[in-house]
A protein has these predicted regions:
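Peripheral, non-AAA+ core regions of ATP-driven protein-machinery
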Residues: 2-13, 17-81, 88-94, 101-111, ...
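Conserved RecA-like ASCE P-loop NTPase motor core of nucleic-acid helicases/translocases
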Residues: 120-124
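Divalent metal-dependent catalytic cores for phosphoryl transfer on phosphate-bearing substrates
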Residues: 129
């Protein structure tokens, strides 16, 4: 008599299992994530293999011949920038983003452009073949060389890959796929993990450049087990406000290029178009005669970007002042307010403080500290900062202004866009001022020096 399947409880966040239901997952600590499921029967012959290409024997690293892997340009400059120059044969890319942000549109455009000189396959698990064809027609794409497969069963997809041997494959999306070897429903942790492992293994063995579309949770993280991001070569996040025409792709992980690289796109009626000069867009409505505004030169991968930081400091009307940020770290705001109080003598304990990075950009680097403080100071005093001025620099707890990486590139970008003055860390001053003839550069080593420059400036 066959044994009845055993009931287990599996965490939807980390994939950990337990025999009894608990309110808190014992593996990752998340609450209310354990879901009842049936334990998979133990197979007689193991089906597990490495998702990397099989190794024949142990060999010394010095004896392995390093071969330069050619890249396949996608034809979309901003996407190639994020990927490090194009797609690599055998690489697996995971693209995540909010629903409706434009993931499927971008990938359909990509493989339509690449179909001119290589075999491509678009696997749709969310739309029918007619829906995909209608979208391609609406975007005005030349889809003659694009092969389409509407399928969610992973074994059928593997058979199609062996028969057609495409060079580029898009799987839209990994959460809709399922394997006959797993009893749980599509989208479960075990299904996502197994399907991704099988597709990754096949991509490595056949040299296929594969792009997996991933859903995101309400917190913005890619849905499914964390191992999904570990097994792929590149993780990209599609960001942007759905009420805005601009979208951004950020490389969180990239084995074949620079991480934190950023690509900017504009959504049009004919699909997504790359933006070669995003700083001009982010500063399109910038006015330097308004209090509470300061331009930051931030660095996204190898690209310097000029972003307007807006601050509003106003009298609080409750017992607890509000501290709200959009596109900036809220914890860092609390730290900067304490530094501003201790080292500049400006107390905001009875003030509401609101910060905004214009254009929907998310800024995480400490180089934004100086621009944030100057914007808050300008709003607090209701006086604009000096005209055509930019700022960048990290601020420490003792009020010192620390240097940041790629200072020369940031200054060149500011001068190119017509700015006349820059407040930077003293250690980031250029060795030769003649390299920046149109830019007055003030180096500061403390927060007090920066405050004095703005106070004595033509504000």
């Amino acid at each position: 008599m066959a044994k009845a399947p055993k009931t287990v409880y599996q965490c939807s966040e980390c994939g950990g299992t337990t025999l009894k239901w608990q309110g808190k997952c014992p593996h990752c600590g998340e609450w209310n994530t354990l879901q009842e499921s049936l334990a998979a029967p133990e197979p007689k012959n193991t089906r597990f293999q490495s998702w990397a290409a099989d190794s024949a024997h142990v060999q010394a690293l010095s004896e392995v011949t390093a071969i330069e892997i050619p890249r396949q340009p996608t034809g979309i400059g901003e996407l190639d920038r994020v990927l490090g120059g194009g797609l690599v044969n055998g690489a697996v890319i995971l693209l995540g983003g909010d629903p409706g942000i434009g993931k499927s549109t971008l990938l359909l455009q990509t493989i339509a452009m690449m179909a001119a000189d290589r075999k491509v396959l678009y696997v749709s698990g969310e739309e029918s073949a007619q829906q995909v064809a209608l979208r391609a027609q609406r975007l005005g794409l030349q889809s003659d060389g694009v092969d389409l497969l509407a399928e969610i069963r992973i074994e059928a997809i593997q058979t199609a890959l062996k028969q057609h041997e495409p060079a580029v494959v898009v799987i839209d999306s990994i959460q809709t796929m399922y394997s006959d070897q797993i009893t749980s429903a599509p989208g479960s942790v075990s299904q996502v993990r197994e399907c991704a492992a099988q597709l990754t293994r096949m991509a490595k063995q056949m040299g296929i450049a594969m792009i997996l579309v991933g859903h995101v949770t309400k917190d913005g993280a890619i849905a499914g087990p964390r191992v999904l991001e570990h097994m792929v070569d590149t993780v990209l996040y599609f960001e942007g406000d759905q009420h805005s025409n601009y979208r951004m792709i950020r490389a969180i992980k990239n084995r074949f290029g620079a991480a934190n690289e950023l690509g900017v796109f504009a959504m049009t009626e004919h699909g997504l178009k790359g933006v070669s000069n995003p700083s001009a867009i982010f500063l399109a409505s910038y006015r330097d005669d308004v209090p509470g505004s300061c331009v930051l030169v931030t660095q996204e991968g190898s690209r310097p970007l000029l972003v307007e930081i807006q601050a509003l400091v106003d009298d609080a009307h409750g017992f607890t002042p509000k501290r709200l940020t959009v596109g900036l770290e809220q914890n860092r705001l609390a730290m900067l307010l304490a530094v501003l109080n201790r080292h500049a003598g400006i107390a905001c304990f009875d003030q509401d403080v609101f910060l905004n990075a214009v254009g929907g950009v998310k800024i995480n680097e400490p180089a934004a500290d100086l621009a944030i403080i100057l914007a808050m100071l300008s709003s607090f005093r209701n006086r604009p900062l000096p005209e055509k001025m930019v700022a960048f620099g990290e601020i420490g707890l003792s009020g010192e202004v620390r240097p940041v990486a790629r200072g020369q590139e940031r200054l060149k970008e500011a001068e190119k866009l017509g700015f006349k003055r820059a407040i930077v860390p003293y250690a980031n001053l250029p060795r030769n001022r003649k390299d920046f003839p149109g830019l007055q550069i003030d180096g500061v080593s403390s927060l007090q020096e920066a405050v004095e420059i703005c106070r004595n400036g033509d504000g």
